[in-house]
């Protein structure tokens, strides 16, 4: 009968373990010096060796031939533990046996002396699944356990272990195993099992395992049945586990950086039809951008592997592609945040796509395309019609609508607000947005956004007509861009919004109305400030006479918005429209990528 690889090749001594050298050294010294605590807590990602270490410790403290370095695996104690027949080693699955009655049974047996071993060892896997009552029943026993008992708790969710338990145990965090170590182990096992597989395929499996040796062994076990005669290639691995090949990833990156919406979504259609693993796809995408960033900064082709060099030469990456990558990474404090910036770039494409998704062609980045120019002209004509209608209605638009809280009416619950796909902004007024931004005001944000505004104004007012037109054509909503360039300064700012002043009251009111009725302004704000922000626009006179005085005297009563509502306001929104099958597929693609889970 076939034995799965992760069981067959599970380490049975300290020497065979991978990637946890410091933990191994501490535990061996504790055993040699007889300084074992009442309990250990082993935490970390799946497949990093927590339960394996627990079993090896159980052998080490009872091994008849312990040599102060490792267990023998030949004495009766080691053999019984290896075959799971040792009475004094109790392994409990806390995910299924987590009730108070299960713990009471355990506690009753704790004080019984070991049958054959020197120490009894209780291993509780998935300890975070224990109930509060179970932890309470175990607490006293753990604190006053007899010297012949050792508790070992393993968990993937360290934060769920009660503090009262943590303070009575020694905790060790098991780090992820490096891809190099996993690759080395996979290569050894492939030779032992006589699996014909290319090195690149093993490298891909090691990468797919994401630091979990158990996952890597399971993947190797699965792919080993792919072929008996021919060598298993990296293409075979990609097909088996629904992974996008590197060529397609490079093509997708270039499409995103170029703003080629049609190409990007065509690629996503292909990925979806092939059962793409989106989580792994995003991680691979980011890894490739980091390599491209290193190449762009160092100007050294040797930082890329052979496949990446070929892809760059084939796809003709241009300077603007590298420029965006450098900006995306360097404007953040770490690579984790830069990944969010790259995702924001994809968000901008989604916004642009939704602006034109009922019209063809989808490509809007090429001014030389006659159809594309016709599409943009049609869009601008619609904007002009909206502008003319707006001028007729402008005199009826009130700056500060009454917003006193009617206590007789029930206010919506937070989850009702945050779950709305299209945010209702009809009940908002300029004052409550400005006051909310002021509540989270930070001078660092003011200075940061003011600098970006100055850069935008400088580029927008470039005397070189060709440069000016080129920069202007990058904006999805050109009308709001023309208005924002006339801003005088930013007076309040937070991570979700800005209060911005204008000399002309008409411009300020026009931007505000568009912000709450259409959402196009948010797309322009994103392009200028590289961040989703809600805009509260005032004339200098309005701000001075209204907001400043009312904030000072605290006379203005307005509905208080919570932080979640405010952050949702910052996100670009669009009117609900009938959505075709392809548009629903777009929603499916990006729902998991850009929404919090």
UniProtKB/Swiss-Prot annotation:
Residues that, per the record, bind ATP: 44-51
Consequence of gene disruption: Probably essential, it was not disrupted in a global transposon mutagenesis study.
Molecular-function GO term, any one: metal ion binding
Enzyme Commission identifier(s): 2.7.7.7
CDD domains: AAA, HLD_clamp_pol_III_gamma_tau
The reaction(s) this protein catalyses: DNA(n) + a 2'-deoxyribonucleoside 5'-triphosphate = DNA(n+1) + diphosphate
Keyword check for S-adenosyl-L-methionine: no
Family statement: Belongs to the DnaX/STICHEL family.
Assembly and binders: DNA polymerase III contains a core (composed of alpha, epsilon and theta chains) that associates with a tau subunit. This core dimerizes to form the POLIII' complex. PolIII' associates with the gamma complex (composed of gamma, delta, delta', psi and chi chains) and with the beta chain to form the complete DNA polymerase III complex.
Task of the protein: DNA polymerase III is a complex, multichain enzyme responsible for most of the replicative synthesis in bacteria. This DNA polymerase also exhibits 3' to 5' exonuclease activity.
Name of the molecule in the record: DNA polymerase III subunit gamma/tau
Species in which this protein is naturally found: Mycoplasma genitalium (strain ATCC 33530 / DSM 19775 / NCTC 10195 / G37) (Mycoplasmoides genitalium)
Species classification: Bacteria, Bacillati, Mycoplasmatota, Mycoplasmoidales, Mycoplasmoidaceae
């Amino acid at each position: 009968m076939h034995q799965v690889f992760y069981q067959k090749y599970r380490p049975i001594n300290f020497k065979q373990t991978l990637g946890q050298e410091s933990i191994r050294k501490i535990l061996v010294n504790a055993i040699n010096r007889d300084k074992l605590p009442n309990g250990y807590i082993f935490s970390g990602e799946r497949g990093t060796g927590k339960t394996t270490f627990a079993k090896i410790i159980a052998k080490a403290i009872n091994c008849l031939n312990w040599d102060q370095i490792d267990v023998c695996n030949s004495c009766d104690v080691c053999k019984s533990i290896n075959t799971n027949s040792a009475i004094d080693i109790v392994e409990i699955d806390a995910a299924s046996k987590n009730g108070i009655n299960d713990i009471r049974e355990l506690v009753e047996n704790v004080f019984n002396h070991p049958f054959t071993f020197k120490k009894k060892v209780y291993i509780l896997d998935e300890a975070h699944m224990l109930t509060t009552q179970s932890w309470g029943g175990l607490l006293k026993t753990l604190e006053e356990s007899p010297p012949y008992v050792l508790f070992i708790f393993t968990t993937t969710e360290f934060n769920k272990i009660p503090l009262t338990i943590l303070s009575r145990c020694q905790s060790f965090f098991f780090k992820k195993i490096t891809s190099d170590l996993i690759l080395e182990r996979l290569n050894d096992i492939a030779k032992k099992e006589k699996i014909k597989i290319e090195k690149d395929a093993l490298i891909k499996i090691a990468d797919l395992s994401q630091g979990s040796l158990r996952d890597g062994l399971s993947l190797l076990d699965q792919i080993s049945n792919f072929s008996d005669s021919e060598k298993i290639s990296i293409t075979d691995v990609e097909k088996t586990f629904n992974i996008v090949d590197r060529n397609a990833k490079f093509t997708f990156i270039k499409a995103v950086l170029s703003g080629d919406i049609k190409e990007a979504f065509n690629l996503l259609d292909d990925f979806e039809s092939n059962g793409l693993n989106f989580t792994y796809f995003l991680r691979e995408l980011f890894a490739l951008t980091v390599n491209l960033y290193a190449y762009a900064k160092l100007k050294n082709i040797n930082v890329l592997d052979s496949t990446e060099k070929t892809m760059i030469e084939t796809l003709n990456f241009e300077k603007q592609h590298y420029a965006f990558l450098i900006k995306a990474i360097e404007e953040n404090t770490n690579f984790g945040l830069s990944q969010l910036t790259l995702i924001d770039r994809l968000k901008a494409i989604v916004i642009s796509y939704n602006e034109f998704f009922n019209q063809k062609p989808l490509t809007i980045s090429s001014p030389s395309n006659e159809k594309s120019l016709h599409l943009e002209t049609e869009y601008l004509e619609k904007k002009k019609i909206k502008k003319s209608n707006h001028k007729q209605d402008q005199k009826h638009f009130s700056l500060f609508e009454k917003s006193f809280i009617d206590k007789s009416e029930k206010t919506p619950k937070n989850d009702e607000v945050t779950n709305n796909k299209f945010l209702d902004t009809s009940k908002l007024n300029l004052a409550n947005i400005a006051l909310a931004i002021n509540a989270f005001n930070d001078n660092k944000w003011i200075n940061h956004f003011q600098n970006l505004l100055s850069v935008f104004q400088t580029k927008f007012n470039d005397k070189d007509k060709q440069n000016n037109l080129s920069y202007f054509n990058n904006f999805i909503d050109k009308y709001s861009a023309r208005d924002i360039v006339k801003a005088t300064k930013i007076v309040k700012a937070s991570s979700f919004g800005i209060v911005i002043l204008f000399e002309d009251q008409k411009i300020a009111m026009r931007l505000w109305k568009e912000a709450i009725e259409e959402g196009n302004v948010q797309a322009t704000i994103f392009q200028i400030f590289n961040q989703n922000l809600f805009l509260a626009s005032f004339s200098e006179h309005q701000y001075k006479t209204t907001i400043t005085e009312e904030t000072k005297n605290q006379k203005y009563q307005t509905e208080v918005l919570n932080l979640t509502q405010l952050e949702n306001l910052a996100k670009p929104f669009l009117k609900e429209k009938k959505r075709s099958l392809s548009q629903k597929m777009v929603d499916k693609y990006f729902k998991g990528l850009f929404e919090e889970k």
